[in-house]
Amino acid sequence: TKERWMARLFSLYFDDHTRLSLFANANNVNETQTPGTEGDWQPSNSPQGQTTTRLVGLHLDTEDKNKVVTDNIDATATWTDAVDEMRSASESFASGGNIFRRSMSLNRQKDFRASLQNNMRLRTGNIGMTSWTSLDYSNSRNNANSRKATYDNDPSRFGSIKEVLDSTFFADTNPLLSMITNRSQSISLDRYRSFSASQDTWAFYKLPWGDRLEININGTYS
């Protein structure tokens, strides 16, 4: 549609020992996926609301010419802005008079996430080592606003759902005020950050008589 947009970038370099891909994705059509190593994009499943995404990343596989050391790196940075808005109008039939309801909610979630994974392996002679490193950082903010009200007469003549609720909560003098039987509003603001890191290293040394010494070191932080 007129207000929907999408832009993608995928770049690939490779030689006998290195394969590097760079990618970017910017859109407001709820697409949050990253491509595969061949540049194939898989669709996301986010049917509700509207999410604007900006994403950049890289994938690297490399080795030395003797294949003694191999290294694999994945890194991404993602900014998302998700907006979910709901409006409803209903009428309940009752013996004492019909009850008219109007409600509206707006939820906005803004997130930033950066991640890095590195897997390195070394194999030469009697020595071997594998190192796995993972880093994750996220920063999120959520704003939510919900309004609802009930009336003893049909408020449709005062306008749309939004216009009726605006008059219900913000107008000092209005014919609509005499029709209100109940109203409530909820506003919330949440913000949180997180960081986690993990490291797992395994190494061995093969002794001349065939036995093998092994060591494993791992740690996490969050």
Predicted regions mapped to residue ranges:
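Primarily recognizes Gram-negative and organellar outer-membrane beta-barrels
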Residues: 1-5, 17-222
